Amino acid sequence: MSFWKEKSLAQLDTQEWESLCDGCGKCCLNKLIDDETEELYYTNAACKLLDHQDGHCVHYQERFTFVPSCTQVTVDNVAQLTWLPDSCAYRRLYLGRELPSWHPLITGSKAAMHEAGMSTQNKVKCETKVRYIEDHIVLWPMRDLD
């Protein structure tokens, strides 16, 4: 059953909600906002807890202890999190779109997501190793395939 087609975001249980996250790691990238234009820019500087090989948080259950500023995506705040990439399942479903063809719930694994270049896998640097974050602005996190 494709629960995400049968239920609204508000009707999902915790397990269903968590499974919507494809584990791309894009939400764990540091972002900048231009002071003059208020335009959002993604960087390839990732949270210190992000595993660069597969894009998951190495301390997911305790992430708020290690990174108090980490944002928890919920049904109550997804509308306000406009910085989530267009490829994000939470954002897509909130906006009435389908899950992308490469999503692990569609394909059964993360392999298609990585092959499509839709994750942070091998594309990021740890934020603690970045000196000038402005030098690390990238466009690929904003890319969306379908």
UniProtKB/Swiss-Prot annotation:
Pfam families recorded for this chain? CxxCxxCC
At the top level of its lineage, which domain of life is listed?
Answer: Bacteria
**InterPro entries, alphabetically?**
Puta_zinc/iron-chelating_dom (IPR005358), UCP006173 (IPR008228)
Q: Which HAMAP family match?
A: UPF0260
Q: Which family does it belong to?
A: Belongs to the UPF0260 family.
What is this protein identified as? UPF0260 protein Swoo_2117
Q: What's the source species for this entry?
A: Shewanella woodyi (strain ATCC 51908 / MS32)
